[in-house]
Amino acid sequence: MPSIDINCDMGESFGPWVMGQDTELMPHITAANIACGFHAGDPDVMLATVRAAIAADVAIGAHPGLPDLQGFGRRVMAVTPDEVYALTVYQVGALQAIARSQGGRLHHVKTHGALYTLTARDPALADAVARAVADVDPALPIYVANAAIAQATRERGLRAVYEVYADRSYQDDGTLTPRSQPHAMIEDVDQAIAQVKRMVKEGVVRALSGKDVPITADTLCIHGDQPGAALFARRIRAALEAEGIEIRTV
């Protein structure tokens, strides 16, 4: 039976400011990528999100980002491999400690925003993240795009969990269409469902050019900060289960 994990970025509120639809989304996912205080989140939010994930039997993931609260971690910064190593160890270690304090355990790591982009294309920064995760806990998989970070993850002896998106279009090389370009986002739920079905069952995705591109789909990312995200997640999960696709943590 084909299967897929469903992950969502969570815990991205900060103080009284609320981001995302965490409560509504939690029942529809199998893994939560929890912000660790650098691009979003704070200790109280991290703790509350970990508790909610444990209560819902959702896997707990660390979601480290660049130190950029104002830019939500989406602005590219000039960072060195040593800086990326340090900020990754710091954030992953913090969430790991919170999870343990509540009787849970850290399940995976997924980088956020600009750090995700940088590690997809820069082998040195990708290796810095992989080395940091391996040094914290070599049993932790990393959720990756099929890019530099995937190779670095494998070379460090870690498991690479390949991530796909329902609401993003793809290019001929298997990369996501940049958000700055037309048709980068897929807003029609039926189109998104059809795309995910093919990725899971056939291992291909239809690029914007019309070309079918090979793709590995281990985990599906749902964007929790989009309007109607909870309904979107519920409909996608129901459609996949109706196709005989098992929804489970990797």
From Swiss-Prot:
Keyword Ribonucleoprotein found: no
Highest taxon in the source lineage: Bacteria
Pfam family, one: LamB_YcsF
Family matches, as Gene3D superfamilies: Glycoside hydrolase/deacetylase
Alphabetized GO MF terms: 5-oxoprolinase (ATP-hydrolyzing) activity; ATP binding
Subunit-structure text: Forms a complex composed of PxpA, PxpB and PxpC.
Function (record text): Catalyzes the cleavage of 5-oxoproline to form L-glutamate coupled to the hydrolysis of ATP to ADP and inorganic phosphate.
Protein name per UniProt: 5-oxoprolinase subunit A 2
Organism: Bordetella bronchiseptica (strain ATCC BAA-588 / NCTC 13252 / RB50)
Source taxonomy: Bacteria, Pseudomonadati, Pseudomonadota, Betaproteobacteria, Burkholderiales
Gene: pxpA2
